[in-house]
């Protein structure tokens, strides 16, 4: 499990987890590629109190340090990411490559005080069972540490209902 405290509102931590547009720029070579910055269109469905949406995009590279994903090539197979946003601050993310191999992420952000939160991320997968858990844990540590500056710099600190009042910094 990855646990990270942030000097931000929980809404900003969730916003960051669901923003695939920052992957090529903040996580190049790990979650995205600056040569493929476009985010595919996705439709959001509301079922009860849960928001559902999914995207299909070219896969990111596996690296020697982090052989995390089930793909063997960079672009094919494509990765399907299926998100469920459970309000107020919980996400279930399922990753698949069109076969039986898959990953699941459970992420929740706990408000600690005004503009302070704690994020918890649990990851599971049904492949590479011989690989030490520390590989995924270190990968998530790198990703969360790369996101820290982005999450903590957003103004206003809480995601507003009127997004035109947002100043987004990178």
Question: Across the structure, where does each feature detected by a protein language model lie?
Answer:
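C-terminal catalytic domain of Rieske-type non-heme iron oxygenases
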Residues: 4-170
């Amino acid at each position: 499990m990855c646990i990270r405290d942030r000097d931000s509102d929980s809404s900003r931590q969730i916003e960051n987890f669901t923003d695939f547009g920052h992957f090529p720029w903040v996580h190049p070579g790990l979650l995205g590629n600056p040569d493929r910055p476009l985010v595919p269109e996705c439709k959001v469905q509301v079922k009860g109190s849960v928001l559902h949406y999914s995207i299909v995009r070219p896969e990111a590279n596996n690296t020697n340090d982090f052989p995390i994903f089930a793909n063997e090539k960079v672009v094919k197979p494509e990765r399907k990411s299926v998100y469920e946003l459970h309000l107020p601050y919980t996400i279930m993310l399922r990753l698949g490559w069109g076969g039986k191999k898959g990953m699941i992420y459970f992420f929740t952000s706990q408000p600690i005080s005004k503009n302070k939160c704690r994020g918890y991320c649990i990851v599971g997968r049904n492949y590479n069972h011989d690989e030490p858990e520390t590989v995924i844990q270190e990968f998530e540590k790198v990703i969360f540490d790369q996101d820290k500056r982005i999450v903590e710099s957003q103004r206003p600190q809480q995601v507003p209902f009127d997004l035109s009042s947002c100043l987004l910094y990178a």
